[in-house]
């Protein structure tokens, strides 16, 4: 986005004090909070575009399920894409592929209800860290995929365990379609790049029926989410992803309990202020903390926001209070870094900091940085390049570029799903499709408009494809 007519004095609108010591300070905090919410909407984090992303990626999951699998697998787009909180090229696309021919059951759940073609596995969690388990074969189904069958190993007592390590490796050895470049395995995921610029992390998971875990979560006293949302989360169930607890002697055969679909439901139930609070925290992680190996991840920050939403009245989260809640969230993160403890929202016994890999020097640096940020008060958001750029820009061109960026992203989202619809069994797209052509034509028109305005404002314009990706980063 081009800057035009910058006003370097504008950041002085932001109060310098970290604490609100007077009515005037409170007014400044509230005014700055409202302006921050407006800026975040212009940057692509308004409710409408977030919902459009969620709808598009939910539809993509359904299309991939119908197109590729014939009922054998269910596809979900998870992570920030599924949550609607990152633009098209801003982060990797996380894809979860769940095997519909395998069901894993909690210790005391009966298996007789499942038809004969289903392979049934029993979870053994007593010797595993909270939120992890091993999987013992209870019944081999009449229809069993090679990647599952070849992942069984002996537990030393003549019983068959499903190895998480072997399961990922079996999927890593699959043949790739044209245009796909696979990268080195990253924990449970198999990263790859499609067509040079679409980065995806694919995780192959298994259904997990765990009514005891979910009923315990649902029974907690809470301000949020509402009862109907709690029941939807319970109905969405859980999955097991192929990754063990770091350092466990059973790590290669352990699986981690995850609630991806339920957590996306929870995120969709956050109000506008809570959602933007999560976005601000992710910006701070990326632009200020710069974690090297996910010692602090977006998942860490998401759990802080979910706990805050559950433990406080929903009405207290509004546009005028977002920076006060950012202060609270940063303090919660600082405490987690000091104590190396943060309970997992769905299974509080699991400590998300237990395997953070945080070394002492980095721990001290981050604690010091966050402490400084807490003393800065509302001015902390000036550390964020995207926010600062918007503050010093004139509103009119900012709104104009924001509108074009949002339209361009909507076109990409529609094109993404149309590509699946118009592709044959080899993945070749029918370029004569009228809707495909219309989307391409409108994309070119928007890019031409943006390029012309940038030239008029004295900016250097690269080729259209490079500009397209840069706008949606």
What are these regions (language model features)?
Residues 1-473:
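Non-catalytic helical "accessory" subdomain of NTase-fold nucleotidyltransferases
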């Amino acid at each position: 986005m081009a800057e035009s007519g910058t006003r370097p004095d504008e950041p002085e609108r932001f109060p310098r004090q970290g604490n609100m010591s007077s009515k005037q300070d409170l007014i400044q905090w509230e005014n700055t909070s409202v302006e921050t919410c407006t800026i975040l909407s212009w940057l692509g984090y308004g409710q409408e575009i977030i919902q459009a992303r969620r709808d598009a990626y939910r539809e993509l999951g359904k299309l991939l399920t119908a197109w590729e699998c014939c009922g054998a697998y269910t596809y979900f787009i998870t992570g920030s894409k599924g949550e609607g909180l990152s633009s098209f090229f801003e982060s990797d696309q996380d894809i979860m592929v769940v095997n519909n021919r395998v069901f894993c059951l909690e210790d005391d759940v009966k298996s007789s209800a499942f038809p004969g073609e289903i392979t049934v596995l029993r979870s053994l969690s007593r010797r595993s860290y909270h939120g992890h388990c091993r999987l013992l074969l209870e019944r081999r189904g009449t229809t069993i995929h090679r990647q599952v069958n070849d992942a069984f190993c002996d537990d030393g007592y003549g019983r068959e365990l499903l190895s998480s390590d072997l399961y990922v490796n079996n999927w890593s050895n699959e043949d790739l379609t044209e245009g796909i470049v696979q990268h080195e395995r990253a924990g449970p995921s198999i990263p790859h790049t499609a067509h040079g610029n679409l980065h995806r992390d694919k995780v192959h998971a298994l259904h997990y029926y765990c009514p005891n875990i979910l009923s315990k979560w649902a029974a907690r006293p809470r301000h949020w989410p509402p009862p109907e949302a709690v029941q939807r989360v319970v109905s969405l169930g859980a999955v097991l992803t192929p990754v063990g607890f770091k350092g466990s002697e059973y790590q290669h055969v352990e699986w981690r309990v995850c609630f991806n679909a339920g957590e996306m439901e929870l995120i969709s139930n956050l109000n506008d202020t809570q959602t933007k609070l999560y976005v601000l925290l992710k910006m701070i992680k990326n632009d200020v903390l710069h974690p090297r190996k996910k010692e602090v991840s977006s998942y860490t920050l998401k759990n802080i926001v979910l706990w805050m939403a559950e433990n406080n009245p929903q009405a207290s989260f509004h546009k005028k209070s977002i920076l006060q809640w950012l202060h609270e969230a940063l303090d919660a993160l600082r405490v987690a870094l000091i104590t190396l403890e943060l309970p997992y929202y769905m299974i509080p016994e699991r400590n998300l900091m237990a395997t953070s890999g945080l070394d002492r020097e980095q721990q001290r640096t981050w604690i010091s940085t966050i402490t400084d940020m807490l003393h800065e008060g509302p001015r902390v958001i000036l550390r964020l390049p995207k926010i600062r750029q918007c503050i010093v820009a004139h509103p009119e061109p900012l709104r104009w570029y924001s509108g074009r960026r949002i339209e361009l992203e909507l076109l990409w989202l529609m094109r993404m799903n149309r590509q699946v619809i118009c592709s044959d069994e080899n993945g070749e797209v029918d370029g004569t499709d009228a809707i495909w052509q219309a989307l391409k034509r409108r994309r070119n028109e928007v890019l031409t408009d943006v390029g012309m305005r940038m030239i008029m404002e004295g900016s250097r314009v690269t080729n259209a494809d490079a500009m397209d990706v840069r706008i949606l980063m």
